[in-house]
Curated annotation (Swiss-Prot):
Residue pairs linked by disulfide bridges in the UniProt entry: C31-C77, C43-C71, C47-C73
Domain of life: Eukaryota
Cellular compartment(s): Secreted
Primary location recorded for the protein, binned into one broad class: secreted
Similarity field: Belongs to the DEFL family.
GO cellular component labels: extracellular region
Organism in which the protein naturally occurs: Arabidopsis thaliana
Spans through the membrane: none
Entry keywords, A to Z: Antimicrobial, Disulfide bond, Fungicide, Plant defense, Secreted, Signal
Endpoints of the signal sequence: 1-19
Protein name: Putative defensin-like protein 187
Any single biological process term in GO: defense response to fungus
Lineage summary: Eukaryota, Viridiplantae, Streptophyta, Embryophyta, Tracheophyta
Length: 77
């Protein structure tokens, strides 16, 4: 149980520290960024409002009940 708590904290720190990192993707001049979010609608709205891009959500389940939601935003650079 203690190891899973430590793992959870490390993943949360990683997600927060990597938020707003922008990277080039492919030759189509698209960039991507990501952040921890609170749902699919919030992800899509923030991505569209801030970057005029498309937001997709990835769920990372951790036992017993905690779920981390990560939003990845693809947009034209």
């Amino acid at each position: 149980m203690k190891n899973s708590s430590i793992m959870f904290v490390l993943i949360v720190v990683f997600l927060i520290s990597s938020s707003e990192n922008q990277k080039m993707v492919g030759e189509a001049k698209q960039c991507k960024t990501g952040w921890a979010c609170f749902g699919e609608d919030a992800c899509k709205e923030k991505c569209m409002a801030k970057y005029k891009g498309v937001g997709t959500v990835t769920y990372f389940p951790f036992p017993p009940e905690t779920i981390i939601i990560y939003c990845e935003c693809l947009y034209d650079c």
